[in-house]
Amino acid sequence: MTVLPEKEYIYEDEITKEPEENRRLKRLKRIMGYGKRRRAKETTTVSDMFIYGAKKLLAEGKISKEEIGAIVVVTMSPDYFCPTVSAIIQGELGLDFDVQCLDISQACAGYIVGLVQSFMLLEHMEGKKVLLFTGDTFCRVSSEKEEPPSYSAPFGGDAANITIVENAGNEKIYYEFHQDGSQRNCLVIPDGAFRNPMTVEQIQHQVTRMPITSVVMDGSTVFNFAQKEVPVLINSLTDMAEISKEDIDWFLFHQPNKFMLQKLAERIK
């Protein structure tokens, strides 16, 4: 199930810059395929969307409280540092105290990371299911004021997804992850946690490099990493599963950049 905020923003309606900036943003639309996005109210958190969707699943009989053995939450925009979002959901749904609650801080790879963690939990919970929650209120950490601009604001949107994960026979699961922590500054929210904490004065006067908790992205480095590593991952995974790329009907990539997807498609042919 996917939960979307009601408010929809059309990309063209957000282009209100001076003429030169207007031309740049229109070029971005053509190259990257920007169209529209959803944005949650300032008072709406990711747990609000998760809980709304979970209650709907329960009301529709898609799953019962007794079947839930674990809650896995993947988000970069939690309600608080503490408690965890999964604990908030457990409490709001009135689930048993022995339901396992796990929060994972992941961005683009988050759904797959959460899915694999859910598979692992199922190995130790006979007869139970896992509720996997993935989502963000990303608009709050997107900024058009970054120097250099990262373009995170045009494609940053808010949404939540809930997946019911359960065992189904003895089918094999194939997966592989590549991480490069040495490039951690290429996609980072630099301020607000304990490395660069905010003082009371900074919070009151917004004396920061940019709006508090904004994302900084080195787009070219992210692009190059994806173009280099993703084809390697695909080849490794198909070899592991002993299938060919021609056997696969659809390749689904977590990426809002049309240009990057087109270039990636050329490399994996």
Task: Report each predicted region and the residues it spans.
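Condensing-enzyme catalytic core mediating Claisen C-C bond formation in acyl metabolism
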Residues: 1-43, 146-224, 232
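Short acidic, glycine/serine/threonine-rich loops at helix termini
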Residues: 8-9, 82-84, 116, 141-146
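Conserved catalytic cysteine-centered active-site region
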Residues: 26-31, 35-47, 76-129, 135, ...
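Phosphate/pyrophosphate-binding loops at sites that engage ATP/ADP/AMP, CoA/4′-phosphopantetheine
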Residues: 53-69, 232-249
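Glycine-rich phosphate-binding loops at beta-strand->alpha-helix junctions
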Residues: 74-81, 248-264
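Flexible, glycine-rich active-site loops centered on histidine and acidic residues
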Residues: 123-159
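Internal helical hairpin/lid segments
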Residues: 218-222, 226-235, 241, 249-255, ...
